Regions:
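N-terminal amphipathic/basic-hydrophobic helices that include classical n-h-c signal peptides
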Residues: 1-23
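N-terminal domain-start signal
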Residues: 16-374
Length: 374
């Protein structure tokens, strides 16, 4: 019981570090440091790996790819994991550790209400780690496997999550151990005895986007940020509908799983939930004047041919990235350069992870480049 309380205390402290650290870093004055933060974010973005350098990495052999990545800003984290891991595992652990460090740095140089807005994009990684813990516990992964591979103990930001893993045996015990945090409070609303992993993940998504919309309408925000988040909700709902259809989930269940707050109306999403084919989903979406159908016919055809939703997901991702890039350029002194930097940093991590894993299994440079997002 005492250990359980300590874990809860750590989780609450972890959450407060993300959400309320601004009180120590400028919110007391009630002012955001938008000019300084946007300038620093732009400087960081300029230091990211550009497409030319990424394509050069594509030509690197699998035996030297780790060293090459280390020289591009990941050396400190690579050194941490090289003693215990090797190859793609070491590189991947280093990449995620570097991302955690980078997100912490970004939060530290944001102040005032700006910090709360940026926290929206940092918090999503805490939500993802909560999902990771729930999946690992539900899947019966051993503590040793989780600590060595999934959430490496070398990363201090994994400590609170590893405590949950070590002290819980079931999915519901893991969910209960998160009480006191926004994600834990949302999980507590579910039927403790019957809630499935899928229902818990859906609940976390709803909580995240509900909070994101609330914060995005506050001080130092703008209508374009609200539009971006609502677009992201739409994209999540669209890809979920295609996925749920493939899984033969009932119409009622599909409608229940829709995340509220998007630009697509409830009526349209109700019609989408009743669709019984990819084509009919698209037809229902076309009834909304906020839906851009450009490229969807081709993406669905490719998806059907390949038996995967990757073409549709890629189309939506590119749309969202283009929208964020546009908002960042149109609003050079705002929250957008900071958010755009975070997005580009995450894409760099994803590209490097794909590169390392792909090289390990012998994928060609052409195949890897086709799946990268520059």
């Amino acid at each position: 019981m005492k250990r359980g309380k300590r874990i809860l205390e750590k989780l609450i402290i972890f959450y407060l570090v993300i959400r309320k650290g601004e009180k120590m870093l400028g919110q007391a004055s009630g002012r955001s440091n938008i000019c300084n933060a946007s300038a620093r974010a732009k400087a960081r973005k300029a230091s990211l790996i550009d497409p030319t350098r990424m394509r050069q990495l594509l030509q690197t052999g699998p035996e030297s790819i780790g060293a090459s990545i280390g020289e591009l800003g990941y050396r400190n984290e690579m050194d941490i994991y090289s003693a215990r891991m090797s190859g793609a595992d070491a590189v991947e652990a280093a990449l995620f550790h570097n991302l955690d460090n980078d997100l912490s740095d970004v939060m530290n140089f944001c102040q005032g209400p700006l910090k709360s807005i940026v926290a929206i994009y940092v918090e999503r990684f805490a939500y993802e780690k909560a999902k990771t813990v729930l999946r690992a516990v539900n899947g019966g992964c051993s503590d040793e496997l989780i600590e060595s591979q999934i959430l490496p103990s070398e990363n201090p930001m994994n400590a609170v999550w590893l405590d949950i893993v070590r002290t819980t045996e079931t999915l519901h015990e893991a969910a209960n151990s998160m009480a006191g945090t926004p994600w834990g409070k949302e999980l507590a609303k579910l039927d403790d005895s019957d809630a499935t992993l899928e229902e818990m993940e859906d609940a976390l998504d709803r909580q995240y986007y509900s909070h994101a919309l609330k914060v995005s309408k506050g001080r130092d925000s703008n209508p374009q940020l609200v539009k971006y988040i609502r677009t992201e909700i739409d994209h999540r709902n669209i890809i979920n509908q295609f996925r749920e259809l493939r899984q033969n989930i009932s119409t009622e269940k599909r409608l229940q799983m829709v995340i509220p707050g998007g630009r697509l109306s409830k009526t349209v999403m109700s019609q989408v939930s009743q669709a019984n084919s990819n084509k009919s989903i698209l037809e229902a979406l076309r009834r909304s004047n906020t839906f851009d159908e450009t490229g969807f016919d081709e993406a669905i055809l490719e998806s059907d041919a390949l038996g995967t939703l990757d073409p549709i997901a890629t189309l939506l991702n590119h749309r969202r990235h283009d929208l964020l890039r546009s908002f960042s350029y149109l609003n050079p002194v705002s929250v957008f350069p900071v958010i755009y930097y975070i997005e580009r940093k995450v894409l760099e991590i994803q590209n490097l992870r794909l590169l390392v894993r792909g090289k390990t299994i012998g994928l060609t440079a052409e195949v890897l480049e086709a799946h990268m997002d520059f």
